Amino acid sequence: MRILSIFAAFLASTLIASAQTCLFHTGDSTGYPYRIPAIAKAKNGQLIALSDLRPCGGDIGYGRVDILSRVSADNGASWSEAVPVLQGSGKGADAGYGDACLVADRDRNELLLVCVSGDVPYWQSSP
């Protein structure tokens, strides 16, 4: 009986895993890497997913980094196309935006996005 239970659990997890969706895939048509995903559920039930898109190919401070979002109104069964939330210029204080954290305040019906911005890599920054 124990083996049957283990097999049933394995089968269920396999079925769940096959229903997963990759929202941001490095190697897609952009040719750029995606990193640092974030997700939150808004008061209206929508799921909002964010990720860095890194045209510069590296970390914040090495060039342009954007934050993209995708939204699901059906609890993740389908998703919108990716749209930019913040777009880096590649130089200066707005060179890149990344390492996003997303918080949904359901009482106030607001979203808070916190991220890093700039043109200096972390290891070269000063306090």
PLM regions and their residue ranges:
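Asp-box/BNR beta-propeller blade signature and adjacent active/binding-site loops
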Residues: S18-P127
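Bacterial N-terminal signal peptides
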Residues: S5-T14
